[in-house]
């Protein structure tokens, strides 16, 4: 009986993945606070100039489960010009982001180039505005189609072959930032996938809205608390609401816990060196649509190009 439920769960997983692929897949990133500029171009350069990356193996142990690779580079022109406090005094930043996501018969490669500009509102507040151009190439492997795919009149015609689809669109975002907190709103695919070339095997490409916010506080010289929240809504999939809480100890390592409401819980840890921070996250299902066998592993790395991971003031917190 257990074997029967296991096989049934895998079948439901593959069906759910393929159903979403015909419209637009959702890419989960549980360490979302380390990759703010990918979700909102207005937050480009918020943590200074850095190279970032992650590897995410979702539902490990299940064939065809999502697997994601990400790398980005952010450049804050305020740091280049030698500003004493570039996060506050700087005005412009640029980023290049690349994400590759594999799920079942689909492999998606996304490239985003973003630019952000800042307007100083008060002594400690900035209003950040950003825009980005995204290019996506989605490749369909007809040799990896499932039985559900073959019953679909659009996907079934690609059995045994390969097909590619390209989409060009735009992202926008704005954010209110402070050294201790931020609140932002971003939108991906503003044009709704209006610029498409190649074979159109995805039947809809709706825009998605993303709200992010966070607060951090140094409780003592050796302890800091960091809280982040993330909400994403899109027409053809369920809303996604995530929360993360971390404790940074001695400015050298952190421990945390997070949740994707009604879906999954995660445990996280990481270390900071002079310029580098490395994190690991273990996620397990707790209910909802994806309460299926298999857990998720996520590895992250951030390398500061110009700034060391040391406090400039007593109440500064080094990570989000």
Per-segment meaning from a language model:
Residues 8-16:
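Bacterial N-terminal signal peptides
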